[in-house]
């Protein structure tokens, strides 16, 4: 795995993969071009070609990209060829929605367990899962060898929960808590804060 590729480039690869999957599902063509992908995604064709060039040559001049092949290659680059088990921490409204979301499986992820510290939620069925007490978090994470977790909890408990997850072996975290998390080197953190996204857009209004 190359470590000198800008994170912003890595961040665009899942967008390309998603659009290639849509093209395949439409079933109208076997090949596409950087121009077509750019038009569909609002990204310049030059940017797409530059991004892909970090990982090799995937297309042919005059022919473009074979959709199936490029999809397979991007899946391999993103390590999505096998399914990743994911732990969800927080069984509130957001955790409930995540547990019922069917879009994870199609894209390489399976919600394997969900935790909460509320005794009224523990034991509740969410989708195909039973909410587990957070006191069992380390034991279950280690037993299932889970490397990916989603935090759907309030900000004041996000850091201590992050510490517990990392100590249990989690290497990648998606946090919905509106707070910066401190993690050791080698642990990836991404944030999803809709308020931040709205505030960014209001600058242009």
Protein language model regions, located:
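Glycine-rich Rossmann-fold phosphate-binding loop(s) that bind the pyrophosphate
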Residues: 91
């Amino acid at each position: 795995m190359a470590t000198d590729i800008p994170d912003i480039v890595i961040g665009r690869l899942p967008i390309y993969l998603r659009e290639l999957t849509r093209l395949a599902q439409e079933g109208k063509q076997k090949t596409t071009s950087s121009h077509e992908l750019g038009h569909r995604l609002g990204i310049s064709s030059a940017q797409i070609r530059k991004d892909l060039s970090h990982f090799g040559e995937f297309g042919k001049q005059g022919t473009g990209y074979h959709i199936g092949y490029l999809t397979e290659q991007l899946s391999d680059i993103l390590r999505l060829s096998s399914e990743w088990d994911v732990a969800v921490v927080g069984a509130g409204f957001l955790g409930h929605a995540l547990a019922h979301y069917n879009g994870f499986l199609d894209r390489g992820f399976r919600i394997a367990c969900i935790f909460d510290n509320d005794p009224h939620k523990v034991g509740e069925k969410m989708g195909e899962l039973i909410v587990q007490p957070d006191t069992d978090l380390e034991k279950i994470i280690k037993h299932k060898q889970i490397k990916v977790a989603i935090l759907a909890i309030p900000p004041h408990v996000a850091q201590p929960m992050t510490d517990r997850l990392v100590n249990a072996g989690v290497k990648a975290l998606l946090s919905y808590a509106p707070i910066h998390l401190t993690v050791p080197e080698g642990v990836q953190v991404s944030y999803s804060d809709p308020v931040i996204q709205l505030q960014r857009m209001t600058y242009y209004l």
